[in-house]
Amino acid sequence: MTVQPQTLKIRRPDDWHIHLRDDEMLSTVLPYTSEVFARAIVMPNLTPPITTVASAIAYRERILAAIPAGHKFTPLMTCYLTNTLDVNELTRGFEQGVFTAAKLYPANATTNSTHGVSDIPAIYPLFEQMQKIGMPLLIHGEVTDAAVDIFDREARFIDQILEPIRRQFPELKIVFEHITTKDAADYVLAGNPFLGATITPQHLMFNRNHMLVGGIRPHLFCLPILKRSTHQDALRQAVASGSDRFFLGTDSAPHTKHRKESSCGCAGVFNAPSALPAYASVFEEMNALQHLEAFCSLNGPRFYGLPVNEDFVELVRVPFQQPEEISLGNESIIPFLAGQTINWSVKA
């Protein structure tokens, strides 16, 4: 019988995809990330979106001001690509160290993406410059054609959009974000070292049956949407393989309770409070704890060309129960796995 480890010591992880929002929401959710993660790629889909160096600097300052005392955390800012973005602004932001990467949202693919790109080949000059200067492109990989079934939008994106981009710009660093399908996992595994992918805890732990059978569970609704179990299994196999193409990106995306539990609920899962223990539980189930540190702490920095973190965090086999909800002024946020117990805790 295999003896289960009681503690796991790994280099401090980074979150390569997060939504921190702004104002009171920012100050409420940020500590759950800054307590555990050293760095995070911060999504730019505010209202209005982050499209200039000045707006990115201002947002970064608001984030830094919200970090609790004693937390060491660095927000890595991103530029929201639009049909009319100035290539010089993009270049200046990257060369000044303000923008770590640029984010491609196909128009209307997800929350606050109405300003996204409606004609992707039209912004190929931006991709050409990004390839030249070594700036990573982060992609929400779904087509938005209303005629395409929501469960097929990621797979269709690979053929219609991602493959042509990669053929045209073979040395452009691309992160295929929050992948949800076997198609995407296989595509990344078959790709070259310029292609990586993030995977969320919810897509590793759940499939669409969990969201839809026995009643609709709106707090599992995110985009890209949870897929069938065969896709979930493929994602689990991908992270358990130890491939360095995959790394941690929670896509933690908080919304207030009433915006989730409504007749037209928002997409997004607020998983920051439980993310690292949730990932550990998946890797343990897959008998792959030996690959947890690389997924959480090594693969991402190496893809981005950044140093790995020097300090460590410890996970201990002490069950902890997620709160049912988290206060936000007069409202609340329902966290991922609300009220449920996870077998791992991050040691304070």
From Swiss-Prot:
Protein name: Dihydroorotase
Keyword Zinc: yes
Similarity comment: Belongs to the metallo-dependent hydrolases superfamily. DHOase family. Class II DHOase subfamily.
GO biological process, one term: 'de novo' pyrimidine nucleobase biosynthetic process
Pfam families tied to this protein: Amidohydro_1
Gene designation: pyrC
Origin: domain of life: Bacteria
EC number: 3.5.2.3
Natural source organism: Yersinia enterocolitica serotype O:8 / biotype 1B (strain NCTC 13174 / 8081)
